[in-house]
């Protein structure tokens, strides 16, 4: 068979152009018996690692080859060309070429290249030039110039596109080649691995050009021929140019480069004179251990762990990596930035002693092999969380320390998800925005299995309409396709030498940031080490809470400012609060599922919080571990574990692993320990099991470990049924298994945030509000919860408020929470600073403020809308009237005093007072909360007439009782572990109610569940023994119209039409719910 190499294959990393994944191209090329394939995406190397990973398995079986290249597209008229580096040095030059082009482009994601960029590098590449589709007068001269720049390395690409004049076109291209003295090379210029992807490629093309498939015309391919073809088909197509087929082998002959050749070198860290990196790390670790435990009382267990870890770190030469993370953490702490490590790094006593993590090895059993293992040859990965508002300072420190040539953020591939796929496909197929939106709104969360016909019908669409059917089919295929590259949340790659000779680097959308083209899985594949500089809102909240306590209660805690390490531990009052499920705003345990679990688990000590964090996860739930654990914890079920045969090990070997979790494996480390102890896996095999647990839903790889583990346990005397059950529990972890060390890191913050809520609720509420946006709860729910805990909350006021929410002393010596200007939607921090700067004397009137301040009328209107003039003894309506009398912003300075004087002469108009309901509505419109009431109380009379109860009545209702309730939807959740069950949290003037919606009810009332803001529910009370109350829904109604009607009616009376049009919240009564899929 004639060898044929396809050297111009574009994957879907030629964004919105290629219609196949890199893996699909490699797999298909091998299946078609091609000799090899070259992946050449347009101005990027973003997809090559995925192709390489797929090829690694294939090459073990055959001589099939993969080539790493790029299709260069120029902005100066130079024709497109695919280039392949011959060796490692040439690959580095290709990376630098793309990096230069990316930084030259003004628009993120583009790459502006000119022929001069390639000219001095051309001799290092194999180059195939693509002729223009139509005659260009200067093409022959340009081709000759390219050929002279890289003699013997340039080919002219020849395709047979089946467009009616292939023969004539081929003759023209052959003449160009002859004139320039370059050979022809055959290619199919591939855009997809299989012809059935052509319709999707049309959609991608239409999307790229912001048009529809029907209007795209010549922008689309004329047929479905640009797919991978087998060698015999290519030989037939090029029968008049057999030399072009043979040239593919000549083209690849000098190419030796593979990604395997990338040898990563971590940067050396500065160390004290006369010391090695190993000695410096050794000193820092033992100094840290002495600080934690006392120099003479370091526990023997800890000493042994330190020696073990330091020996392995030295063996693998990872000392510089640990020193880097130590340096970053130290810098953050010197700047007063809270930080804490988490993830598998919390398995390391070295990380604990260095102050990187907060998990004390005397509290939790650490499994260092989960973090670093000599056998698996993977670099360590340390995740450190920093305050989200100050994380950028740390990131810029990293850039400054290592330079932008040697440091960059890892990429994140932004891929199509269900809704975005439907939207883009719908637009491309010419569906109206209304139809596309309706179709997209039928989808909740990720989905690759299509859209239920009934859901399409409920959206008011015809599921039998062929365009609708086509849109759904194409969208399903598009899910998972890369849309564009973005920056990772904080993963840095650092290099000893130029990083841009290993991977291209481009500018990020954020100023002063740059990121590489590979994501975290790609860098794992090629062995690059990553330092994660992550952000965590709760750390910001905790730091602000510590500051407020130190500012307002300096007499407490010995006058010292609290730290993560110094806060009082094991406080009974904190655990009592959590046992009640009173955890709104508390880190990691504020979700509905966690609030319901807390009264059942009843945490009494720190390790209970570790379990609490981990147990409400899809892994333990799907592995059927939750109920057995709770039954054993409450004494309803004995905890008995089998033993191996006497000759194979101690009788309590499983008890040592599972004792703390009542015989139930809840953590990844436990799964690995069971495999190593009960089935005698090596550490490498145990890590393979962990990896299989993490990927089996995508790859199905965990089954390859099943026989080995079960047989290993049976051979050591365990019952086969027990071994199978044990393995099935582990398999249930899926990709959701939680490392114990990670849970322990998060449990630390659970306790600290719960302690703040328990002992300083006003401080905690202020810190939460000042750290928004956070995750679960909106400001209205945070304020409601604070008031339920006895906190006095005061409104925004021009004479008392700051930008942040602050604490004020009250006559009864309690601290009240004063809302800040940040709560007013649309009011800027700059205007706040101007207002406060001129507040040495209190503001007396709005006219007084206007004379003293250079705020525009819009700012005054926002203040009036928010009822922020309370201390001036003027209500919202009068304030709005007064603001309308202020001079226009365009008034010239010369006339400003005259205008103000004229304004002052007009007597104040007596306006009718606003109704309480009007005030509440306006509050929600401007500050997203109200201290005066809740919109539902003004609908209560009508609701009561319908027999609708309050949320408080639901909480007090008897088990099994049928009730009706209505409330504003604040949270929607459909956890992946809940098997289609949807949970709603609704709110009225009396509190909240928790709603459970079973899948069969969800199917009937899907639209109401997904879109209602005010919802009416009929159902039956379900009350657990621990007092957790749900209303199990049987029927739902969308009553949002009542809110909208109230909003429109009251807003018309409150705000002039011209103001309504520019209102920052578009006159919404309630903020949107927070939805979690």
Curated annotation (Swiss-Prot):
Q: Which domain of life is it from?
A: Bacteria
Q: Does the keyword Transferase apply?
A: yes
- What GO terms are given for molecular function? 3'-5' exonuclease activity; DNA-directed DNA polymerase activity; nucleic acid binding
Q: Which EC number applies?
A: 2.7.7.7
Q: Which reaction does it catalyse?
A: DNA(n) + a 2'-deoxyribonucleoside 5'-triphosphate = DNA(n+1) + diphosphate
Q: Which InterPro entries match?
A: DNA_pol3_alpha_NTPase_dom, DNA_pol3_finger, DnaE2, DnaE2/DnaE/PolC, DNAPol_HHH, NA-bd_OB-fold, NA-bd_OB_tRNA, PHP_dom
Broad EC category: transferase
Q: Which GO terms describe its biological process?
A: DNA repair; DNA replication
Question: Could you tell me the keywords of this UniProt record?
Answer: Cytoplasm, DNA damage, DNA repair, DNA replication, DNA-directed DNA polymerase, Nucleotidyltransferase, Transferase
- One Pfam family from the UniProt entry? PHP
Q: Predominant location of this chain?
A: cytoplasm
Where found?
Cytoplasm
Per the record, its GO cellular-component terms are: cytoplasm
Looking at the keywords, is DNA damage present?
yes
Q: SMART domains of this UniProt entry?
A: POLIIIAc (SM00481)
Give the family from UniProt: Belongs to the DNA polymerase type-C family. DnaE2 subfamily.
* Function comment: DNA polymerase involved in damage-induced mutagenesis and translesion synthesis (TLS). It is not the major replicative DNA polymerase.
Which named protein is this? Error-prone DNA polymerase
